[in-house]
Amino acid sequence: MSLTRLLIRDFRNIETADLALSPGFNFLVGANGSGKTSVLEAIYTLGHGRAFRSLQIGRVIRHEQEAFVLHGRLQGEERETAIGLTKDKQGDSKVRIDGTDGHKVAELAHLMPMQLITPEGFTLLNGGPKYRRAFLDWGCFHNEPGFFTAWSNLKRLLKQRNAALRQVTRYEQLRPWDKELIPLAEQISTWRAQYSAGIAADMADTCKQFLPEFSLTFSFQRGWEKETEYAEVLERNFERDRQLTYTAHGPHKADLRIRADGAPVEDTLSRGQLKLLMCALRLAQGEFLTRESGRRCLYLIDDFASELDDERRGLLASRLKATQSQVFVSAISAEHVIDMSDENSKMFTVEKGKITD
């Protein structure tokens, strides 16, 4: 699936843009503040319902406008799909697919699997566990049809349980929540464990190519003790949870531990090496999706040249081309991406929110 057409209206500093896109590489070149990252963010928002640089909707809608509008055409092997997203200042969204309203953002996410690589993406490696849980959950969402519903129900039940912890005095009063929570937690943890085991070889192979000087290991931590039933953990920790007023153990505390030569990667790797590792993990995840489902990711890469020398840029470019996926790359100068260009790619120039090809 590739995005063949993109219409942007009143998004960030872009008043209007109508772009015919390449199924291969699409380059967005312009000075800082020109709007090139806004194009990447528009694509991301069309597939996620939210921007990646700000959660405040007022900052995403163009100044003095009431809403942004995004439309796209997705070309699959057999059919074309029209998609659209409108969001106003109150945060109300309207999702349209093939001319009909009432759809969910999760449907857009399923139609447009994408990988985002930005200068801020180091949080996958040096940020808190929530960023690595999101990495695992992206894979589970696209590989397990029941994951999104289970994950949504888990969040709801944890919120209710945490509220109940402020009121109850005996564990028996929590059993109605835990009766629902326990099987969901175990199912989600099983899916995450299966996904991390399934993608382990892809991550190891890609990392070996990108960072051959390090021995990298990946270990999934489910969020409570090994060999212990979650029901036992919840009951045993009731008094502590009640004092904390939140549930201290469970899939909401899971992590994917990443180590280089036995030490945490954030303590061992340089910024350039961390970026290579981040790119390797995103590529491995996209390639695993293709192998498992036949579907390809869109790759969004902001500020391609940052932190990478010529050799590393060339390595990343060659691996991206090998995926045969659609790729969107922003850069300050065309010189940074010209060696990636071929007869199928498109080069866009961005200046003060105006986009030309």
From Swiss-Prot:
GO cellular component, one term: cytoplasm
Subcellular location: Cytoplasm
Family annotation (SUPFAM superfamilies): P-loop containing nucleoside triphosphate hydrolases
Keyword Isomerase annotated: no
Keyword vocabulary terms for this entry: ATP-binding, Cytoplasm, DNA damage, DNA repair, DNA replication, DNA-binding, Nucleotide-binding, SOS response
BP terms from Gene Ontology: DNA replication; DNA synthesis involved in DNA repair; double-strand break repair; SOS response
Principal subcellular localization: cytoplasm
A GO molecular-function descriptor: ATP binding
UniProt binding sites for ATP: G30, A31, N32, G33, S34, G35, K36, T37
Lineage: superkingdom: Bacteria
Classification via NCBIfam families: recf
Family per record: Belongs to the RecF family.
Function: The RecF protein is involved in DNA metabolism; it is required for DNA replication and normal SOS inducibility. RecF binds preferentially to single-stranded, linear DNA. It also seems to bind ATP.
Protein name as annotated: DNA replication and repair protein RecF
Recorded name of the encoding gene: recF
